[in-house]
Design a protein with these regions (language model features):
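C-terminal structural segments of small proteins and small subunits
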Residues: 41, 46-77
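Short edge beta-strands and adjacent turn/loop segments
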Residues: 16-32
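Short hydrophobic/aromatic beta-strand micro-patches
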Residues: 34-36
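N-proximal, solvent-exposed amphipathic alpha-helical segments enriched in charged/polar residues
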Residues: 1-18
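A generic short-segment signal for beta-strand/edge and adjacent turn/coil regions
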Residues: 1-5, 38-43
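Charged, low-complexity, helix/coiled-coil-prone segments
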Residues: 1-3, 28-30, 69
Length: 77
C-alpha cells in the first residue's frame, strides 16, 4: 500500500480532510497520518480517531491486510 492510497481512503470518507501520511517503516504496511477536518469540531479525540479508523478499516481487515499498523493524530479546523 502507498501513502497516496491511505490518503485517498481517508479523503473519500472525510472529504474536507487535510491529510499527511507517512510510511513509517518503508515497508508499505506501517503508516502514520495527521488528519485535520472541520468534521472533527465538537467531537472527542476518540470520536475523531474513530472517523479516521473507519475510513481505513477495510485495508486493516484480515491476516493478510495491506495495512498492518496505523498511527493517527487528528485536529479540528
Amino acid at each position: 500500500m502507498t501513502t497516496d492510497e491511505v490518503k485517498a481512503l481517508i479523503v473519500h470518507a472525510i472529504p474536507d480532510a487535510v491529510v499527511t501520511v507517512r510510511d513509517t517503516t518503508g515497508s508499505g504496511d506501517h503508516f502514520s497520518a495527521e488528519v485535520a477536518s472541520a468534521q472533527f469540531a465538537g467531537k472527542t479525540l476518540i470520536a475523531q480517531h474513530l472517523l479516521v479508523m473507519d475510513a481505513v478499516k477495510e485495508a486493516m481487515a484480515g491476516s493478510h491486510a495491506p495495512l498492518h499498523a496505523f498511527d493517527v493524530r487528528t485536529k479540528a479546523i
